[in-house]
Amino acid sequence: MSEPTKTDPIKVYDARWETDEFTPLEIRRFIEAVLIYGRGLGVDTVTIARDARLGSGSVMEIALKSAVQAGFTVYLCTDPISTPQSYFLSFWASKDHPKTMGLTITASHNPANYVGLKVVVPGVQAIGLNCGPDGGFAKIREIYHGSETLQLGAGGKLILVDPTERYLRFSMRAAGIEDGELEGMKVILDALNGSAGPELCRALQQAGVSVLPLRLIPDGTFPSGSPNPTSRNKMDEAVALAGKTGAVLVIGTDGDGDRLVFGNARGIMNAGFASTPILRKLLAGGSASGTSLPKPAKIIYDPKVNPLALVEWAKLDIKPVLFGNGHSQIKEHMRRIGALAAVEESGHYYHSLTTEGLTFFAENSLVTVFLLVKALKENPELMGNMWALQDRVFTTGEINYQMADDETRDRALQAVLQYFKDDHAVLVSETEEGIDLLGTIVCRGVDLDAGKLESDWYNGYLRAATNEKSVLRFYLSAGSFDLGMQIEQKTRDIFGRYPGNAID
């Protein structure tokens, strides 16, 4: 095999690449590096799953062939499933094979021309760059660029599986939901042609929910664009349908089903507010996690969760814990501090799940959805209460700009940060524990320790994207709509001075 180039598919959270960016030979070398890493951890079993995107099939073929030839027992799900279901598959295999590694072939909410890989190691522990045993993807990168080869092994075995029914039952038990319990509830489900639509629809119907689906069929071409429900206007059709049908809840999910948005006929809610009834159910024992809860319960939040939501969380006897973006990194931090859950404003909800003696930390979109629908059934006024809070906050949603190159991106980033410095904002780039936030919080008039917000408060988060080339991401919340719109326009004006374009 020829030497791989010094570039590689590895990013901060996982691996992600455009389908024409690397040759099949390079992808095979990358998969082999992952398996060499796993073998060093004592792995003997590998689960392999995929989402619906078109590039996933060829990567799955390479992964399957490499793993079986190397002597691993492989549990393979060939049908497109969600990333949360793939984590369950790894958990299920771990019951009989504790040294299981899970490979999920996905590029999440990225455009159709992307593909990627998420990895969990024994204990269903997610890895990232410098995150996980031996540095996680940092070790895989070292192997990829090194000379070590994957040794062939005897005894390789392929077992085809369909974990959906087991995943559905596991999730219903975890959420404390019985068959038919949510009868009378009507929801709109927009799956954006991702892989999670069928399993979400099936689970909700099993619980008695009337589901009106949109873009339900998995389609890796993503005909309506990037499968990101947090993008502006992406959920407009679902919101309009809720108004016409009287549905109590709108649910949107991304390409691999680990990102959720919630709303109703009025629009889509911030995750900080939508998560509040979910967290309340968790604290009240609405999720059968099997764990006793410390007081106050630690809930991790990312820099984009708006401060007013955090003030509401504190009323629930919650200790909000700031941490940067990064799915693997967040789950590892949950493990370290014993957090009950975590919420990212991007729509990622993480749970601590304990069953059959194993605790693992992962997204489970079925559990998240079940808990919210159950809360709405028990309290029909709940959505109105959440909107009353959201009406007090201006938010931009995620603003994304694709710059001409990384150098241009970095210059634009510094220009925006200088604008906030000149506005006497507080700039924060790490947690109190010194953990890098992988971006910069810009805030003014926010005192979370005292639970106080000034009338002209704002809170923003600015960072360079880790999984896409030359992309800047910005998110803003503010206590004044006029101030929020003013800051948004100023930020867009600064971005516009540099070669590039706004993207979804």
Regions found by a protein language model. Give the residues of each.
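Glycine-rich phosphate-binding loop
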Residues: 99-114, 242-264, 269, 320-362
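Active-site nucleophile and cofactor-binding loops and adjacent substrate-binding regions
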Residues: 75-83, 268-271, 323-325
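Phosphate-binding and adjacent anionic-ligand microenvironments
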Residues: 293-504
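N-terminal small/polar loop signature for handling phosphorylated ligands or for N-terminal nucleophile
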Residues: 36, 44-114, 202-263
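An N-terminal, well-structured beta->alpha segment
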Residues: 1-70, 157-187
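Gly/Ser/Thr-enriched, mixed-charge loops and adjacent short helices
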Residues: 2-4, 115-245
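Gly/Ser/Thr-rich active-site loops/lids in small-molecule metabolic enzymes
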Residues: 213-215, 267-286, 358-371
